[in-house]
Amino acid sequence: MISLKGKKIVDLTDELVARVARIDGSIEQGTDDAYGHKWLSEETINETDGTMEHLVGANIGTVSDWPIGGLSGHMGAHIQLGVRHNDNWTGLPDGMKGIWDVPLTTYYGEACVCVLDNVRGRPILPEHLSNVREGDIVLLTSCWSGDEQPTLVGDTAYWLAEEKKIKMLGVGVPGISWETNYDGPEPDNSPTHRAMTGNNIPIVYPLANIGSLKQDRVFFISLPLNVERMEGTWVRAIAIEEE
């Protein structure tokens, strides 16, 4: 029998509070994710059995700062791969996969914890990631925010993907500025996306509480929804470490 005795489970996802449009017309405001996105929902009645349910999303135009109403799989903590996400970019290799194409074992395993408080406002270099082993899931965070966050530059992203052959990249936000040149011209835009998804390495973010982990190696689990054709899905990410 599998036992978690002597182990501690750490939640690496921030709690979101949904904005709910109630049946009576009232609105209960919620909280934003790390990127300022709201979790929108609408209360309704299931006519089959009379139970109350919540539809994910809102009527178009009813939320001024998110007028499209619909939610994507990229709100809150989520995981993404390249197919149907950035395989429309030029310069990416053949053979890219979607979330649904890779084995479930891709999404859990041994992870190294990289707390980069000492890299304040500077590029993250391989020398800062000396605890990363080949095939690791890599969890990055720092205590910094805004312009003081360490930045994952393209050369280091490719080093992780192609030399260390990491299994998955998990990023604390705020804490790490993990993408550069995202608005640049192709094929030089978004090197971290290109390094990871071009090598079929999932990215999971925005994560929280990585800095609370006590060990620099943990067991990490972040399972996507089992929905084909979705380029990104919401996750509940956890780490398991020794107490």
Where are these regions (language model features)?
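Active-/binding-site microenvironments in catalytic and ligand-binding cores
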Residues: 1-243
